[in-house]
Amino acid sequence: PLSGAPSGIPAGGSLRADEQLDGPVLALLTTARQQQGGGDLNGAASSLERAQRIAPREPQVLYRLAEVRLAQGDAAQAEQLARRGLTYAGGRPELQAGLWGLIAQAREQQGDPQGAAQARQQAKVTL
C-alpha cells in the first residue's frame, strides 16, 4: 500500500493549486495519480517525467515525482526531487511542508533518522 501524503498533510492537500496548472500538465498529473493509485508506479513516473519536461519548475510535479520515486524505493532520487521542489515552492507553506515530509521519509529509507528528524522539524516550522 502506498502512503499518500506525508503525515500532517491532508491527502492531495499539496496539490490544491491544481487549477493554476497548464492543461497538459494537469492532465498528466491526473493520469499519474490514477496510475499510482492502480499500482502502476512506472507509468506514473513516466507521466510525471513528461509533465516535468513541460513545467520543469512546477513544485507540484516535483512533489508527485518524488512521491513515486519513494514508493519505488529510490529514496536518494526522491530526496533530490523534493529538495528541488523546495527551491520553487516559495510562498506555498503547505506544499513546502509536504516536500519536507517527503525528504524525512526519504532520509529514513536511507538510514538517516537524524536527518529525517531535522526534515520533520523543518516541515513544522514551515506551517
Spans of model-derived segments:
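Alpha-helical segment of the N-proximal tetratricopeptide repeat
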Residues: D18-S46
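Canonical positions in the second alpha-helix
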Residues: A51, R84-G85, A89, Q122-A123
